[in-house]
């Protein structure tokens, strides 16, 4: 257990220390427009603007008519407004949301023509046309969205989606095929059998050096580094009469037990965009990133599944822990190094720390690697009450408005050397999928 941080008020008995400075909750925001000023070279999309536009498309997935509240401004933004805002921040040049919308439509029409020209047979063309007719322009220019809609339609499917990924990144799920064997070999020449005067037989050629070992397949495609990898993370509730973990309800969940070597590399997000969502004081995200190492910083966007158990009214007074059930968090890490890990989890509201929990875990050697398990760590009462109050809100957009100002910062260090091994920033929305909790992992960078 770590020492209580500045402003700590009490320890609730589960290892969480609290602070009053960040306990405010609420929603906010009025309708806002992104970039309505006079455009810079209106209608011209220079390379820097196009680059920022493509980056914004990756950061902000299609969200229909739903809007997002940015805590630093308290305004609600649609996707096109966020893209226009991103372009302004990155390039200093203004593009209105209407210009962004027009540009998306132009690209969608172009992509539609190109995709149909790539398909060889009429059946595939007809199916693609029918599917694309049901999609918005925003979905049409998103390769993953289109692939999910169309699915593999024939022998041309692989080529099709490599083409659709365009120049914004590497093709999706393309294996790294080497043109030559990587196996080292030895080439030697047998000297001729001759007694010619002055003849010196040639020396055997030295073997070629072995190839440099490749980094693990997950390293650029999952949450982890060469020194420490996250294997699993979950926040859950178990009913009082649960007999095994299958009866859990998972609010959020990450599983990296079997990382796919064919998965695309992680997308990047500028860490400066989320500085204000975390404490500015000692131990905040800005200071941690300044110290580095930069490759150990990640952002996880969770779409949390809040569809569980009884309603808030049935859960008991304030939805507290005494209302029944066990609320917990489990995580597992792996490493090739023998260490003792310290894991700090800070819950933040409006960019200020509310509570913090510090845990320590020793290594267990399993199958030639060191495993670190922090299992069934009790969730603090603040979080349990927060979940129940959040669930009582009548509309999903209200829940998302509250979650816009709610974040968690998790820092894993080597206890003995104080080296930072992993730093993960978590942000949240409410899941709309019947498949439950979902997530997306990004790498935090600073250009």
Swiss-Prot record:
Primary localization class, coarse: nucleus
GO biological process: cellular response to retinoic acid; embryonic heart tube morphogenesis; embryonic organ development; hippo signaling; lateral mesoderm development; neural tube closure; notochord development; paraxial mesoderm development
Key word Nuclease present: no
Listed SMART domains: TEA
Region (Transcriptional activation) residue spans: 172-447
GO cellular component, one term: intracellular membrane-bounded organelle
UniProt keyword annotations, A-Z: Activator, DNA-binding, Nucleus, Transcription, Transcription regulation
Feature: compositional bias, Gly residues: 25-40
PANTHER family xref list: TRANSCRIPTIONAL ENHANCER FACTOR TEF RELATED, TRANSCRIPTIONAL ENHANCER FACTOR TEF-4
Name of the molecule in the record: Transcriptional enhancer factor TEF-4
Lineage: Eukaryota, Metazoa, Chordata, Craniata, Vertebrata
């Amino acid at each position: 257990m770590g020492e209580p941080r500045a402003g700590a008020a009490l320890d609730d008995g589960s290892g969480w220390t609290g602070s009053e400075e960040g306990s405010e909750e609420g929603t906010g925001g009025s309708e806002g427009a992104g970039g309505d000023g006079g455009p810079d070279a209106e209608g011209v999309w220079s390379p820097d603007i196009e680059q920022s536009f493509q980056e914004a498309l990756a950061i902000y997935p299609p969200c229909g008519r739903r809007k997002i509240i940015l805590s630093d401004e308290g305004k609600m933004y649609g996707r096109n407004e966020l893209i226009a805002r991103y372009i302004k921040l990155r390039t200093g040049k203004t593009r209105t949301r209407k210009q962004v919308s027009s540009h998306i439509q132009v690209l969608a029409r172009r992509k539609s023509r190109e995709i149909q020209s790539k398909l060889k047979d009429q059946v595939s063309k007809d199916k693609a046309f029918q599917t694309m007719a049901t999609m918005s322009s925003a979905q049409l220019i998103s390769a993953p969205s289109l692939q999910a809609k169309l699915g593999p339609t024939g022998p041309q499917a692989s080529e099709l989606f490599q083409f659709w990924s365009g120049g914004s990144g590497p093709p999706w799920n393309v294996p790294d095929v080497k043109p030559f064997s990587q196996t080292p070999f030895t080439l030697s020449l047998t000297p001729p059998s001759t007694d010619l005067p002055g003849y010196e037989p040639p020396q055997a050629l030295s073997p070629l050096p072995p190839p440099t070992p490749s980094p693990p397949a997950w390293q650029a495609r999952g949450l982890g580094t060469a020194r420490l990898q996250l294997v699993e993370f979950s926040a859950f509730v178990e009913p009082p009469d649960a007999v095994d973990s299958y009866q859990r309800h998972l609010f959020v969940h990450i599983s990296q037990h079997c990382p796919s070597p064919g998965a695309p590399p992680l997308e990047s997000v500028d860490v400066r965009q989320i500085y204000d969502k975390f404490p500015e004081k000692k131990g905040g995200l800005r200071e941690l990133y300044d110290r580095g190492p930069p490759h150990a910083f990640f952002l996880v966007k969770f779409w949390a599944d809040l569809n569980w158990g009884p309603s808030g009214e049935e859960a008991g007074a304030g939805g507290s822990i005494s209302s029944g059930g066990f609320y917990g968090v489990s995580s597992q890490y792996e490493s090739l190094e023998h260490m003792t890990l310290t894991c700090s989890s800070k819950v933040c509201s409006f960019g200020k720390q509310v509570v913090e929990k510090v845990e320590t875990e020793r290594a267990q050697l399993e199958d030639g690697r060191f495993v670190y398990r922090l299992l069934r760590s009790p969730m603090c009462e603040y979080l349990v009450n927060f979940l129940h109050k959040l669930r009582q809100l009548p509309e999903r957009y209200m829940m998302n408005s509250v979650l816009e100002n709610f974040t968690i910062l998790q820092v894993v260090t080597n206890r003995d050397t104080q080296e930072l091994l992993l730093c993960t920033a978590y942000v949240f929305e409410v899941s709309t999928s019947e498949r439950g909790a979902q997530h997306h992992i990004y790498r935090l960078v600073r250009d």
